[in-house]
Amino acid sequence: MKALDELVFDNRFARLGDAFSTHVLPEPIDAPRLVVASESALALLDLAPEQSELPLFAEIFSGHKLWAEAEPRAMVYSGHQFGSYNPRLGDGRGLLLGEVYNDAGEHWDLHLKGAGRTPYSRMGDGRAVLRSSIREFLASEALHALGIPSSRAACVVSSNTPVWREKQEYAAMVLRLAQSHVRFGSLEYLFYTKQPEHLKTLAEHVLTMHYPHCQEQPEPYLAMFREIVERNAELIAKWQAYGFCHGVMNTDNMSILGITFDFGPFAFLDDFDEHFICNHSDHEGRYSFSNQVPIAQWNLSALGQALTPFVSVEALRETIGLFLPLYQAHYLDLMRRRLGLTVAQDQDDKLVSQLLQLMQNSGVDYTLFFRRLGDQPAAQALRALRDDFVDIKVFDDWAQAYQARIAAEENGTEQARKERMHAVNPLYILRNYLAQNAIEAAEKGDYEEVRRLHQVLCTPFTEQPGMEGYAQRPPDWGKHLEISCSS
């Protein structure tokens, strides 16, 4: 493991030039102090965990100091926001400090969010508040622990710098890690501003740096697009299977790598509600939980439009058409596993859809249902869960079909089923009320709850003694919280 001054930089994106980003220095925040750090995220940079305890660590990730090799850049992009094209967005408060080349041969972007004003800040102050920084940190690391592809968060640094949102808050910075920060909107910007040479340069960069194996195909850009479609189908299947609602699926928030990216008013489901809207600005429900699948496909179509100089429209349409069947296959496989099933059968989609409708009608806690279903032998678990449902007879019919389905597999003991189910059904998820409790403590200067919650979320499938309070249904005030985009 390395010290902070031993990191190796190879700033590939910065070398593309000023058509793609603008050199900007971070604006430091006052009295920086570390709120929380992720040891596993820092390990991606080969950074020893004790480095986060040094004063230099907080100074670097609050904008006070920089490596000589860093080349901070604000990236330019556009995007479709709530379905309407916005011609010029860009990093309004975040900076790509540089790319670290680790000992495993990987490049990791260091993106400092809340780093101050840039040419793309529009009327904003370029700051992020402590509240949103903690939420992004916890969400990134929670999704990663669940096995859902995501950008990572290495740390949060707080300050005494006041900023105004609905009220006075304090500025913070979060260090985000990803192997690329190129978005769908990065390519859209160059396409719609009619910069064909720069569009080709960026497309080549994505192809050679992130999809090099596609270069061997007869149509490299089509092969790359197909893999992006495949990755997004798998990503959205995992969101839906684990009850994650992103909240702002604009094309500028979609990663070219098919990872969860740009956290805002996200939420995990408490009670199952397919129509759940986590963003209080989403008045029409465009980005509701159930709409995430069609919106992802719509966003892929928007990306495909930007690739029309390199791939035929017919081939792009055909590839986009693969999204839904790929999604359905991934989703059904995940839901089978959540139910403890190991063999695919034709009626599995009906078994799943009937269960979800029952949960919807009865307001059943989505996460705890699956965990409790695996806690005991099936017959006992179903009896214990029965009282959670309004229509007992319909639930009993479903339970009978489920037990028959388990019996048909004949592939092991109840203990083996329990172990299988506990390996894929988390006990701990990032419920909004848990995040809110941690934020309120942090805003008073107490960071212990953020750190404790982070540690719990790092091992979501394993029961942790003394942490029972993190595995409960939310109190009434904590249910169905809608979160503001204000950050």
Curated annotation (Swiss-Prot):
Q: Which cofactor does it need?
A: Mg(2+); Mn(2+)
Q: Which reaction does it catalyse?
A: L-seryl-[protein] + ATP = 3-O-(5'-adenylyl)-L-seryl-[protein] + diphosphate; L-threonyl-[protein] + ATP = 3-O-(5'-adenylyl)-L-threonyl-[protein] + diphosphate; L-tyrosyl-[protein] + ATP = O-(5'-adenylyl)-L-tyrosyl-[protein] + diphosphate; L-histidyl-[protein] + UTP = N(tele)-(5'-uridylyl)-L-histidyl-[protein] + diphosphate
Residues that hold ATP according to the record: G90, G92, R93, K113, D125, G126, R176, R183, D262
Residues noted as binding Mg(2+) in the record, renumbered to the chain:
N253, D262
Top enzyme class of this protein? transferase
Active-site feature positions: D252
Signal sequence annotation: none
Query: Keywords, A to Z?
Result: ATP-binding, Magnesium, Manganese, Metal-binding, Nucleotide-binding, Nucleotidyltransferase, Transferase
Cited Pfam families:
SelO (PF02696)
Nucleus as UniProt keyword: no
Enzyme Commission code(s) on record: 2.7.7.-, 2.7.7.108
Q: Name one GO molecular function term.
A: AMPylase activity
Q: What superkingdom heads the lineage?
A: Bacteria
Family, as annotated = Belongs to the SELO family.
NCBIfam families xrefs: PRK00029.1 (NF000658), PrtAdtaseSelOPseudom (NF045949)
Function field? Nucleotidyltransferase involved in the post-translational modification of proteins. It can catalyze the addition of adenosine monophosphate (AMP) or uridine monophosphate (UMP) to a protein, resulting in modifications known as AMPylation and UMPylation.
Q: What does the record's free text say on domains?
A: The AMP-PNP molecule (an ATP analog) is flipped in the active site when compared to canonical protein kinases.
What name has this protein been given in UniProt?
A: Protein nucleotidyltransferase YdiU
Q: Which organism is it from?
A: Pseudomonas syringae pv. tomato (strain ATCC BAA-871 / DC3000)
